[in-house]
Structures are given as structure tokens and as C-alpha cells.
Amino acid sequence: MLACASLAACDGPPDRTPTLGDASAVKGRQLVADKGCVACHTFPDVKWPRGGLGPSLEDFGRQGLIAGRLPNQPGMLMQFVRNAPALVPGTAMPAVSMTDQEARDVTAYLLTLKPR
């Protein structure tokens, strides 16, 4: 019994990395329109408006980096879509008011964007 307790203590703290959980890419697609992302970015399934200020996100799901600097991983992307300036100072992308669930949904949508 003591050996089991000792081994359990060696595992370290539990992994608290955010996950997509019950995220909905369909809701995320609607949110990029509702939150104004389409004003600056282009998306493969949005015909208008087609923003040109920010980068095209048409194949975002296959990119290795967010904003050319951060690893394209769900937890990092959830933080970035909510508060890009906190992660990449000087970015033109503003902080966007959204709930944790909305950030998960937008992240799920963005990660589906891959070349066909």
C-alpha cells in the first residue's frame, strides 16, 4: 500500500491543459461571423465579407503556428482567440469578448479548416 502511495506521488500535478470537450465547430463557424472575425480574416465557407487586414484562415487547421509564433494547439488557440494582445504584444488583432465555451467552439471550427 505504501508503495502505491509513493508511486502516485511521483506523477506530479494533474494535467490542467484546456480541452475542446463539448466544443461545436458549427457554433464556432457562426461565432466568427457574430464576433466580427470575418471583417479582418477570410474563411473558406464565408463569401462575404472577406476581410483583408488579417491573414487568411482558409487552411488554419494545418498550420503549425498561431500568428507565426505560438504552437497551434487547442489550449493556446483558445487563449489567443480571446486575448491575442496578451500572448503576442503589438498584434493588430484585438481582444475579443467571449465565454470559455465560445472560445472552445471557435477553436474547434478553426482547427477544421484544412485544404480540400
Residue ranges and their predicted role:
Residues 11-12, 40-47, 62, 82, ...:
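Detector for the c-type heme attachment site
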Residues 6-9:
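C-terminal motif of bacterial Sec signal peptides marking the signal peptidase cleavage site
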Residues 24, 36, 73, 77, ...:
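Stable alpha-helical elements in mature extracytoplasmic
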Residues 25, 31-32, 87-88, 115-116:
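Short sequence/structural segments immediately N-terminal
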Residues 51-60, 80-113:
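Axial heme c-ligation environment in periplasmic c-type cytochrome domains
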Residues 28, 34-44, 93, 106-109:
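The canonical Cys-X-X-Cys-His
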Residues 25, 29-31, 43-78:
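Gly/Gly-Pro-rich "capping" loops immediately C-terminal to redox-active cysteine motifs
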Residues 11-33:
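Electrostatic cytochrome c docking/interface patches
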